[in-house]
Amino acid sequence: VFMLVSHRARGESAREVGWRLDNFFEAARLLLPPMLIVTMLLVGVGWYEGTLDFGRWEGGQTIMGVPGLSLIWGVLQQYALQGFINRRAQVALGRGALSVLLVASLFALFHLPNPWLTFATFAGGLLWAWVYQRAPNILAVGLSHSLMTWVMISSVPPGAFHNLRVGFKYFG
């Protein structure tokens, strides 16, 4: 609710925030090469470790009941990260490296104390913030987030990301 009130107070339209389709393919074009490279690396790790399983989800659960929720969750996280935080970072620091670094750092901080997930979200945050600043499209970066999460979970050993736990749940 706070973000919606903030958008209204600043006079930001849904289109300006990134809820649009006219630049979806431009955003996808920017996202696709790094996504393919990371996917090949992660699938290679999964193949080498013998942990490759595209049906696996957190804690060994099947992914079959999760896709819709995962897609929504990725889009919502990217709305908060890009549509709100990135836009405010650009106001404070300008478009470019400093605001991209701030956005990626904040995204990583939200995933502490999980070390590998913090690293992965920093790397993903760099890509998504950079792409959003060039082609602001929440749906494209949100779908990318969801797909890369699925690839990561399906490829690396199940315990590597501690079942995606963050905060105090990481220790439980």
Regions found by a protein language model. Name each.
Residues 1-10, 30:
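Alpha-helical transmembrane segments in multi-pass membrane proteins
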Residues 11-76, 86-87, 91-92, 162-172:
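Juxtamembrane helix-loop-helix connectors linking adjacent transmembrane helices
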Residues 28-32, 63-67, 97-102, 118-122, ...:
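Hydrophobic alpha-helical transmembrane segments
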Residues 79-102, 130-137:
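Membrane-interface helix/loop boundary segments of multi-pass membrane proteins
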Residues 100-109, 124-128:
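Hydrophobic, membrane-inserted alpha-helices
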Residues 118-172:
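Functionally important transmembrane alpha-helices
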